[in-house]
């Protein structure tokens, strides 16, 4: 089941639990706007290359639409649509005043030079600048993009609309980015994991963790969990996987990964097959890479007691059912990885106010938002006798539905 089908299925289950009117349900599912643009740029060798860019603006009942822009060769309309919809529910679960959006360009960023990436970003911004804005749609980094990408978007957008630092988040700090934003998603994963474990009388210290993915989210989650006393025993990335039952030295692994462009060859553990990582013996499994990695083919072999979805849609619905029967608790993506968009909100607020927060305030506010969101999800679980995923979806969908009705937008 692809990401769009799975997300729509979860939404429909939540709508049924909430008893939503069929017309309202239909209107909440249909995106506000779908944008598809051609982006043609001159390559460094003088040839022309064309790429297709997408932006799906799903819902704005609760505020400006919010979501990342990813550069990846497999970007397609269905994936962008699904991720935009997920952002709508995620911002509602976090209770920040945003709707959902997502964008992307079908390209392989590793095959493009820095100057080519800049030209591509600026052309894409030229095509969508009148459809995004501080109070309309606020992009952010995602897979294949970073703070530099946001700086280019800000600069290009400002040529048309005047200097507008709040038009994107995840910017460099020197251009109005927030302190703590780089680590925000990984730190949110830590806070969400702490909240879940505390419900069962446990803490981070002494728990065994396995993390799939060592990009921004996975590496920060690993560092922060290790600092909190957790034992990270196995990690993978696109280059390979490494395991040490006594716990990996995360600081050394970060250094090795930076110097060697991946964790392959790390001497502080034994190399293992990346495919076996998800089924390693552990207490907490954190998928922090691509979607759909936990499926009906490997769900029965998963030994973790808890799964924290740091990636978007890492667990297929079929696997969800299998794991539920096994008693595995899954903290869903729309709660577990909401730290990034929450601190993006803090950045947006700082830009609008023209007042910068210190990092301690950012992190303290993030802990408050994540912990409160977890408590709200648990309350929905009790009210509707459902699991954490449906608790999160019913919470998010209910908040968006109420805003839609209050604004008189229901069909």
UniProtKB/Swiss-Prot annotation:
Entry-linked PROSITE patterns: GLFV_DEHYDROGENASE
Keyword NAD tagged: yes
Molecular-function annotations in GO: glutamate dehydrogenase (NAD+) activity; glutamate dehydrogenase (NADP+) activity
Enzyme category, top tier: oxidoreductase
Gene Ontology biological-process entries: glutamate catabolic process
Pfam families hit by this protein: ELFV_dehydrog (PF00208), ELFV_dehydrog_N (PF02812)
Keyword annotations of the record: NAD, Oxidoreductase
Catalytic activity: L-glutamate + NAD(+) + H2O = 2-oxoglutarate + NH4(+) + NADH + H(+); L-glutamate + NADP(+) + H2O = 2-oxoglutarate + NH4(+) + NADPH + H(+)
Active-site residues annotated for this sequence: 102
Consequence when changing residue 18 to V: In strain: cv
Keyword Ubl conjugation in record: no
EC number annotated for this UniProt entry: 1.4.1.3
Outcome, altering residue 370 to M: In strain: cv
InterPro entries, per the entry: Aminoacid_DH-like_N_sf (IPR046346), Glu/Leu/Phe/Val/Trp_DH (IPR006095), Glu/Leu/Phe/Val/Trp_DH_C (IPR006096), Glu/Leu/Phe/Val/Trp_DH_dimer (IPR006097), Glu/Leu/Phe/Val_DH_AS (IPR033524), Glu_DH (IPR014362), NAD(P)-bd_dom_sf (IPR036291), NAD_bind_Glu_DH (IPR033922)
A Gene Ontology cellular-component term: mitochondrion
Record-stated family: Belongs to the Glu/Leu/Phe/Val dehydrogenases family.
Name of the protein in question: Glutamate dehydrogenase
């Amino acid at each position: 089941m692809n990401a769009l089908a799975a997300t729509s299925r979860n939404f429909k289950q939540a709508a049924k639990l909430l008893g939503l009117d069929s017309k309202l349900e239909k209107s909440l599912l249909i995106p506000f706007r779908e944008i598809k643009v051609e982006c043609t740029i001159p390559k460094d060798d003088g040839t022309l290359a064309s790429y297709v860019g997408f932006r799906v603006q799903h819902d704005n009942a609760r505020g400006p639409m919010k979501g990342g822009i990813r550069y990846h060769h497999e970007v397609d309309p269905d994936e962008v649509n699904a991720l935009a919809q997920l952002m709508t529910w995620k911002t509602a679960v976090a209770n920040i005043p945003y709707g959902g959006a997502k964008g992307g360009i079908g390209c392989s960023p590793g095959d493009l030079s820095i100057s080519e990436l800049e030209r591509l970003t600026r052309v894409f911004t030229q095509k969508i600048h009148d459809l995004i804005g501080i109070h309309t749609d606020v992009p952010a980094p995602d897979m294949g993009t970073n703070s530099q990408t946001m700086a280019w978007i800000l600069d290009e957008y400002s040529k048309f609309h005047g200097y507008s630092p709040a038009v994107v988040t995840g910017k460099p700090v020197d251009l109005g980015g927030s302190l703590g934003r780089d680590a925000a998603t990984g730190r949110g994963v830590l806070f969400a994991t702490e909240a879940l474990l505390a419900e069962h009388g446990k803490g981070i210290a002494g728990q065994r963790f396995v993390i799939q993915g060592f990009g921004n989210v996975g590496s920060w989650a690993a560092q922060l969990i290790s600092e909190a006393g957790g034992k990270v025993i196995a990690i993978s990335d696109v280059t390979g996987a490494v395991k040490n039952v006594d716990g990996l030295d995360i600081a050394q692994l970060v250094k090795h990964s930076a110097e060697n462009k991946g964790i392959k060859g790390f001497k502080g553990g034994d190399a293992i097959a990346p495919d076996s990582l998800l089924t390693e013996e552990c207490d907490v499994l954190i998928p922090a890479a691509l979607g759909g990695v936990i499926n009906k083919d490997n769900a029965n072999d998963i030994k973790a007691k808890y799964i924290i979805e740091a990636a978007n849609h890492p667990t297929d619905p079929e696997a969800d059912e299998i794991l539920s029967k096994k008693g595995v608790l899954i903290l869903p993506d729309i709660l577990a990885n909401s730290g990034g968009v929450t601190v993006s909100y803090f950045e947006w607020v700082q830009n609008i106010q023209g007042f910068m927060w210190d990092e301690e305030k950012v992190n303290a506010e993030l802990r408050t938002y994540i912990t409160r969101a977890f408590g709200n999800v648990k309350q929905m679980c009790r009210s509707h006798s459902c699991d954490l995923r449906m608790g999160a979806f019913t919470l998010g969908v209910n908040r968006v539905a109420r805003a839609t009705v209050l604004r008189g937008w229901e069909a």
